[in-house]
Amino acid sequence: MPPLLLLPAIYMLLFFRVSPTISLQEVHVNRETMGKIAVASKLMWCSAAVDILFLLDGSHSIGKGSFERSKRFAIAACDALDISPGRVRVGALQFGSTPHLEFPLDSFSTRQEVKESIKGIVFKGGRTETGLALKRLSRGFPGGRNGSVPQILIIVTDGKSQGPVALPAKQLRERGIVVFAVGVRFPRWDELLTLASEPKDRHVLLAEQVEDATNGLLSTLSSSALCTTADPDCRVEPHPCERRTLETVRELAGNALCWRGSRQADTVLALPCPFYSWKRVFQTHPANCYRTICPGPCDSQPCQNGGTCIPEGVDRYHCLCPLAFGGEVNCAPKLSLECRIDVLFLLDSSAGTTLGGFRRAKAFVKRFVQAVLREDSRARVGIASYGRNLMVAVPVGEYQHVPDLIRSLDSIPFSGGPTLTGSALLQVAEHGFGSASRTGQDRPRRVVVLLTESRSQDEVSGPAAHARARELLLLGVGSEILQAELVKITGSPKHVMVHTDPQDLFSQIPELQRRLCSQPRPGCQAQSLDLVFLLDASASVGRENFAQMQSFIRKCTLRFDVNPDVTQVGLVVYGSRVQTAFGLDTHPTRAAVLRAMSQAPYLGGVGSAGTALLHIEDKVMTVQRGARPGVPKAVVMLTGGSGAEDAAVPAQKLRGNGISVLVMSVGAVLREAVRRLAGPRDSLIHVAAYTDLPYHQDMLIEWLCREARLPVNLCKPSPCMNEGTCVLKNGSYRCECRGGWEGPHCENRILRGDAPMARSFHQEPAGLQGPTPSQQAPKHLRIGKALSSAK
């Protein structure tokens, strides 16, 4: 045949070519839920009497690689089966051109033997004769119990059978056999749906996603009471999912001339012939996928103050904390009990509180102890629980270390029974604090903290009065519906802390810490704050008055919990020049701050308040010098009034950048320049004389606490260095760096080199300098960067 005459045959071959397909199943859930699905599959257990047969497709269309994935799915499913002769029996049959029994159901009596046998199955190849394999099973499961127990058939195939499957599959289902169709490689979903039992959504899975497929299989079996979960709070939920197929289809692209022979001798006809192009098109099939979800360690939202909870397995987690709260277990502010006190936590363990409420109470005490107790603390703690009877789990002070106390707390069991709060209070009054019988100044203050979520079933007024008569301070923590009863027990509304939502319970920790000591220091101990004092050290103030200012700010500092996680304090003085006495991150403790304040220099000369405020904006209130993103910031300026003529604009610039400014002006006359500098009326405190400063201390603390509670803008002041731009996004921020800089805060100069890890070790090219100290990331940001890169 002439070559030209072969063209039609070639075109016909292309036209009728079978196109390849790519299939995929995707469950539409977030990453956290996907992690819970994976964890839940490890918490499920099938221990009922049941016969399970794996029917593995070993044909050439599967291929050896996909066959190994089929075996991996079968092995993973066996991990949840209680395999024994009297409970779960497992067998395996491979099919290709013909079915081949790998091992019957009565061959092995342990899970490990079954898993080893599945692992040793050899791929055989051949045609995909699914129908023949199903017909063989019509005579019964090899080694099975003849239908006296439920029968489960798990078909793992690509759904490309070369024979009919609908009738033999229907016959098996009519005999009561539950059929799962598990796709592998690029399955045909329509054939899998034909094979599977009803409801189809619960019996069609994809073996390529082993943990998801195992969860789906066990979830369906649990609805038939064949499987259970270790946690009673686990539940089966439907999730939208999508089965997608990427099909290659042909489209008419146009016509071209081709030559054909004719009936007339020596004649060739030129005719238009169509030609085609190939195009890939997604075909989607929406469905519901039923999966078991178990409560995760992050469901209780243990990370406070905007921290992000990262689960680590079934019951462990860690918190990614904002910079202001780094280093703490649950991003909790560092608090302390500085008074000498004995505290007994009394936990309601009755049926009215429920197991969930009892666990919340234990979590509350655990967080409180972790937040406030130190090894050198003068406070001692004990823990007791009650329902029908009182049980003292940890007598007051009888523990070696805080971790020992926490371990004892974790081991306290839930007792149930009636809520006999009155009886518990009587026993606590008599025996709750051991043999401590000292009185007066020799005995620490004794406090009982009652945590309950249910009303007492016995009388409480008399026992509570008896406890208070024995010099016990009673504090009550509970829900709003119990407020009246808690007031009756404690004797005062001031001794009651209520919450509207169970999760709000944990927000009471700072308030409880404040109330425990007999003389709680006023202020906002739990509020984070970056605070800078600006002192006028010019000649117009004088050395003696400057000393009065120093004494005043030292007394104010005593009202704050100074540490890198709560309140940071800096000090700037100005006169003949502007000088930073110490920055925000210079001194991590209150004692060090007080000592440095006493050593601040008196400068003399003529001062410029405007220059000093600009110095604070450029050299003090920056992330390079210790300011923390997302933490309220305030400047308290103490001045005699002179030198304030140029300060109004710099003060307004600070306020526009998210930094609050309060002016304390000392002198008989309030100058107009100071009024303009103060801005809003509530940002000015006028003091008649330097000796009167202590009388305005409470007013200053109240203003600072009010500013500390205001919402903050994470980009004001900007945490981005080297002229980077701060962009708010989803409750956080990111830095867009200018050319030549990179890093979370644009702190790293981009150098030439093959790998980022090698840049810091390369010799810098001539004329190219590394970042100056002001351009480098401050310590607290470098730590954050190291953590993020480690992740």
UniProtKB/Swiss-Prot annotation:
Stated name of the protein: von Willebrand factor A domain-containing protein 2
SUPFAM superfamilies with a match to the protein in the record: EGF/Laminin, vWA-like
InterPro entries, A to Z: ECM_Assembly_Org, EGF-like_Ca-bd_dom, EGF-like_CS, EGF-like_dom, VWF_A, vWFA_dom_sf
Keyword check for Transcription: no
UniProt cross-references to PROSITE patterns, sorted A to Z: EGF_1, EGF_2, EGF_3, VWFA
Ranges of residues in domain VWFA: 51-221, 342-516, 530-704
Organ and tissue specificity: Detected in uterus, kidney, and skin. Also detected in intestine and lung of adult mice, and in calvaria, femur, brain, heart, intestine, skeletal muscle, and lung of newborn mice.
GO CC entries: basement membrane; extracellular region; extracellular space
Ranges for region Disordered: 762-791
GO molecular function: calcium ion binding; identical protein binding
Subcellular location: Secreted
